[in-house]
Design a protein with these regions (language model features):
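Sec-exported extracytoplasmic/periplasmic mature domains
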Residues: 1-8, 39-46, 90-98, 138-139, ...
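VWA/integrin I-like adhesion module and closely mimicked acidic/polar interface patches used
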Residues: 73-80, 84-92, 96-113, 117-165, ...
């Protein structure tokens, strides 16, 4: 993992979700820990893109993925509750409040960005829709960018266009596998937002309390996996 595009001191966290969420690692600037966790996830999930891939897995490979996803399926008859996953991730950030997020909360928290990876196909009844979750994050000045993680053949589906509309209408960037944009571009944009926020807060601090301001960017990566596992007995 190449951390050259991320300024040292910026904190990163990872939350995964299906019907419920699990924190893989909380906000941290321990990049050794982050690298270890992401490498482990990459090894477990590599090449798993369809039910056919799952059917071809060995029992050991299947168990590795089941272990990694443990804690994300604790509600019956519900999967992929995307809005709930976004809110759970946002709750990792200082100052975020469930239900009634406001600018008072935003003033107490650090600049933050969430990267949401999903195909936006919901099964079940979530507590928060994606739009409701984005309303809450926007109120507390958390930017949410979207990475469409479904198949290319579904990029024109209504669920995909709905996700694009929701993300972009709340100030985020929406990327698909085939739109020509890259993760590096997204990271650069996040860094640009961080630099602008630092500059603005510095100007404010020079007026209100010279020399006393501090700021760090919290970048949250949400990786969402559709769990269609069939237990092998």
């Amino acid at each position: 993992w190449n951390w050259s595009s991320i300024s040292r001191g910026q904190r990163i966290g990872l939350s995964i979700f299906n019907s419920t969420s699990r924190t893989v690692f909380p906000l941290t600037d321990d990049y050794e820990l982050v690298t270890k966790q992401l490498t482990s996830a990459s090894k477990a999930l590599k090449g798993v893109e369809s039910q056919d891939d799952i059917d071809k897995m060995s029992d050991a490979e299947y168990q590795d993925i089941a272990n990694w996803l443990e804690g994300t399926q604790n509600r019956k008859d519900a999967t992929s509750l995307i809005g709930d996953g976004v809110v759970s991730c946002a709750a990792m950030l200082p100052g975020f409040a469930y239900g009634e997020a406001n600018h008072a909360n935003a003033d107490r928290q650090r600049a933050a960005s969430i990267v949401l990876a999903t195909d936006n196909v919901v099964s079940g009844k979530p507590t928060y829709s994606l739009t409701e979750a984005l309303d809450l994050t926007q109120q507390t000045k958390i930017t949410v960018d979207g990475l469409y993680s479904g198949p290319k053949a579904s990029e024109s589906d209504q669920t995909t266009t709905d996700m694009k509309s929701a993300i972009e209408s709340h100030g985020g960037i929406f990327l698909t596998q085939s739109n020509g944009a890259s993760i590096d571009e997204l990271v650069r944009d996040i860094q640009s937002r961080r630099d602008t926020d630092v500059e603005n807060k510095a100007k404010s601090s020079m007026v209100d309390a010279p020399g006393l301001w501090t700021l760090a960017l919290a970048v949250i990566l949400i990786i969402w996996i559709v769990c269609a596992w069939r237990l092998r007995r």
